[in-house]
Amino acid sequence: MQGYFTQRLLLTIPTFIGITLLVFTLTRLVPGGPIERMLAEAQLSSGETASSAEGFGSQSLSEDQLDQLKAYYGFDKPIITSYLEWLWKVLQLDLGESTRYGESVWDSIIERLPVSIFYGVTTMILTYLICIPLGIFKALKHGAPFDHASSAFIFISYAIPGYVIGIACVSFFAANLEWFPLGGFVSDEFEELTLWEKIKDLLHHAFLPLIAYMAGSLAVMTFMMKNALMENLSADYIRTATAKGLSFSSAIKKHALRNSLIPLATHFGQNISVILSGSFLIEKIFNIDGIGLLGYEALVERDYPVVMGILVISAVLYLIGNILSDICVAWADPRIRFGEAK
Amino acid sequence: MLTPQAKKRWIKFKALKRGYYSFILITVLIFLSLFAELIASNRPVVIHYNGELHFPTYGDILPGTSFGYDYQWEVNYKDLQKQFNLEDKGNWLIMPVIPFNPLESDFIEGEYPPYAPSIESKHYLGTDMAGRDITSRLIYGFRIAILFSLFLLAVTYIIGVFIGALMGYLGGTFDLVFQRLIEVLSNIPILYVIMIVASIVTPDFWTLVLLLAAFSWMGLTWYMRTETYRENSREYVMAARAIGASHSRIIFKHILPNSVSILVTFFPFSVVSGITSLTSLDYLGFGLPAPTPSWGELLQQGTANLEYQWIAISAVAALSFVLTLVTFIGEAIREAFDPKKYSYYE
Amino acid sequence: MKFRKINCAVMFLLLSISIQSNANTLPADLSWENNNNAKPWASPLATKGGKFTDFILTFPPTLRTVGPDSNSSFRSYINANQLGLTDFHPNTLEIIPQIATEWAYGQDGKTVFYKLDPSARWSDGNPVTADDFLFTLDFMRSKHINAPWYNNHYTNEITSVKKFGDHTISITGRVAKPKEELHYYYGLVPTPKHFYKKIDKNWVKKYNWKIIPNTGPYQISKIKKGKRITFERKSDWWAADRPLNKNRFNVDKVILKVIRDTNIAYKHFEKGELDSYALVLPEFWHNKAKGKLYDNGYLEKFTFYNNSPRSSSGWFLNTDNSILKEKPVRIALAHALNFDKVIKTVLRGDYERLQAFHTGYGEFSNKNISARKFDLKAANKILDEAGWQQRGGDGVRISNGQRLSLNLVYGRKEHSDRWSILKQDALKAGIEINLRLQDSSSHYKTIMQKQHQIASLGWSTGFRPAFWQHFHSENAHKPQTNNITNLDNKNIDKDIEAYRAETDSNKRVKLANALAQQIHDSAVFIPSFKVPYTRGAHWRWLKFPDAPGTKTSSTLYSPFGDGGIFWVDSKTKIETKAARKNSTKYSSVNKTFDQYRENTSD
């Protein structure tokens, strides 16, 4: 078992290099890098209104000056050289500097980390809190009206994209009814509030985004739970247990439930990287300054160091998550022995 | 012909009413959408002109000159219909139920688009911001989305099953290398790749199918791999190997047919994810080029203009209706293929 | 048409200049001008106080105004509070004083002398002196600021800055120009020498988030990264008592909130969290700006017709393309595009058709030119005669096996609707147009590589029409230049060169008009739309002078620059908030101001 995990840990290295090298190469192939963006901004009219500009966009730059810009953005070397330089820096935990904000990528990410973690973790906890009981209940009442009604509801919420639900919530509950704030992570005067008010303020802001976040994952988890439990309920060992006189409810508690949690546990590990990335569309709608939005803006604005920085973190989390989910499964089901099947 | 086992499953599937009816409904919808030109189009289904019948739905345009107008471009059938009625010379034409094609902007004099749903104007679900009929766009959008997801599914299944089976069957280095490749691919931000491709060539239907397929075949591979592992150690495979069956024969004749149940249960969910992916891409503007009819684009218009509720409502209703149908089918298939009968305790 | 600030350098160079310049003596025969009688455009009714909240879509990437990523929309807020030597009167376009109180012109036609206001102060209390202007030149020429355009401009265009005592300077440019253009192209904005001291290679990083001392009415007082930026009015601003500044810059605080979605921002406005909302886009003006808040008069709508250079937006036809190199095809295409239908439908009749490449430049625009009208008969006739008479089964014309099918690249998703309407009518002329939306960076790259067939875009405006960059053959057939139609015409070249060399205003006007005609005749540019107005809605507590804007206003809600003429009436604010609670009604307000409206026939 220990050998298996060591091997898995070692295998993450080529994977990590594969991921980052591929994306790094892609950033070089994209037409319109930071330099083009800079040139475009200098010359094009940005809006529909008559705008005035500096009037010296007319001058083209000399080769020397273009080279200077290329060097500033690190585009002056062959891909593999700059990749190795980048990798060397990453190994020293230096993710470089954002070409757009000019500040350290680490700082940008860390600044937004609390927000993303808050939403990621809360969404996950709430999803588990709702899905597990709901899944159990649906499994026990399989085929009953409640099962059908809740299935229909869950499917519909699954079918509508989270960002659409978000927009609908904002326009209805926040704008029309004014029950909730229009967005943001906390109020402007957050610092002046007492602890209790702070918590209230945070939850007040978080309510609608959480609904939008949860809408999608609700269906998957609930059905995973329901199916797993139903499978286990029909398994021989439950029949045996009830036949031996164990009451049905304790049979569920003692055996079926625990086994049914295995698929959810697998899911947990894989979810770790999702926690952080969030959904940039939901973040945009609710004006939440999270990692998802940072990544999307960086993509659109061709801020490659930030793109790569976020990729490094999400890749590392994904790889750790995979190993973690193996551990979770092993813990939830002592029968599973990794690395021995071969 | 159906094997007895398949027949049993089919009977069981039919017994699950919700899934079965959803299946029938969606099949009918797909079938109808293949003939969308007869349902929603600016071209009549049939024209009777000077004793001759024309069927302009498919094929070349009929220029204005062929009906006595002085212009070379496609005849305006709405004008033609009015003229036929006015002249009363025995000429007639039958328009489809929805007399608009999805790309056509229909403007009402003195009013600005979007136009609200109205039976009189024949815009049964209203129009979008550019005056295009929403019903027509939904129908064509459905055809594109469902075909897109079916093709996507075909490609991902072929790649996923093939590689998954080989990984499980061959094991060893092959397995190890592809495991890494899958890990690498599942970490590439797909939106990013699509943005890059979109900036080099405008993505068309097939580019998008292949692009998405390249990054979504991995999910199935894991299941296929485990399944092959399991089947591989069964007696019948060992027996086949013992009598000298070739690798390809073992995979195709023995392992694949026995893994079919897992493939089929994933079917509807792949369709759902195909439709959702295309919709989100269109929503963000990285999907099929404008003015292709698309649900995502309609959704985008609807959410940006919530005052005109019919746009968002039509898009969301259509999307959730179809996705819910497919999910119902999926649930029923899963149950029909489940070898274990569920026990119920009262 | 604001007089744009052209900011600031290498220490040793600076020293040498100032030592040398101390020895300078003023020419004796200068005749000083001041324009102290310019007419103010603010209202005496204005009262000071209150705060004004607006929104920005993204948090600015830096507070620097030069160097990488400084060209965000936020820069205008900082620049507006960094005064130049002179400015242009927003209504009359006369030269008006800023830091300079008087100016005079040299004999060579390329030098301007300025007397600085001795009371001018930086926001940190230090006086603004001639050295700050000399420093600008060093600063802008420094490699360390990583701004090659600025390096070029301040090296090639501005030849020297001389000091005649602490409060008098002269600026000499490369070539002689008409007087007002000397101010526009050669005018300088001071750079606080005492603050920067030295420009080294860390400059870009070091000054990313530093608040630079300024000379304008407001200064940034608080920054909450990613969320908001607050400007505060200086209580003892040195120029507050100037006649042109009186009754302006009334609010105490200007708060810019970051809201990333315009729809959500509008909801903030309706809640009263924002004081105003610009509603230039037809979708917003007609769809969103209605309902109880407007009917009850809490929100007021203003449409203000302005008159300033219009962005040269439209379709650019690449003449290096095998189909578009034929002029008849270009002319036919122009006749096959029904821009008026787009205006009448999705643009709701608000926008107007742009008639030529340069409009709104006063007499420099050729008002006799009008864009080719939508005319299918003409388009079809031209194409029939040009050898495209054969049509395929889909109605698209064919010549020598080639379909008349063209790709249009554009960079804004919102424009898809407009172009799909044009596409439908163009097909009637047998022209197929394929819409190719690209994200804005790749769009620009495609065009700069000259890989497009048709490109839709809008060039930003300048002080005077610019021909050389867009139409001279020197910029054709090669990447990274602005001649994106690859127009290559010897006669046009000759006139452009003459236009560039001319210093006499009247002759320049003539040349500009002649050039405009030639460009129209070449049919390489199909003008699309112009927005002849600025408009928006605001809460009724925001009060305005009788004319809420100026001839050149691009928005009515600018708190800085040549704006700042509105004020917040705190009594009305309390009253309105109470009225909203108990549904008291006021009369609804929807005003149009067309005193500066262009004659629509031009």
What feature does the model see in each segment?
Chain C
Residues N35-N37, I56, Y77, K224-I229, ...:
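Detector for C-terminal structural segments
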Residues K143, A147, S221-E232, K257-N321, ...:
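Extracellular/periplasmic solute-recognition and catalytic clefts
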Residues T53, T129-T136, T168-T172, P178, ...:
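Alpha-helical secondary-structure segments
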Residues K115, Y150-K198, P217-K224:
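Surface-exposed binding/hinge segments that line
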Residues L26-P40, K51-Q107, D138, P213:
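N-terminal lobe/hinge region of extracytoplasmic solute-binding protein
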Residues K206-W209, W237-A289, K423, L427-S440:
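Ligand-site clamp/hinge motif
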Residues Q82, H89-E94, Y186-R248, K253, ...:
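Gly/Pro-rich hinge or "lid" segments in bacterial periplasmic/extracellular proteins
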Residues T101-N146, S170-T172, V258, A265-H268, ...:
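Aromatic- and charge-enriched surface segment that lines or borders ligand/interaction sites
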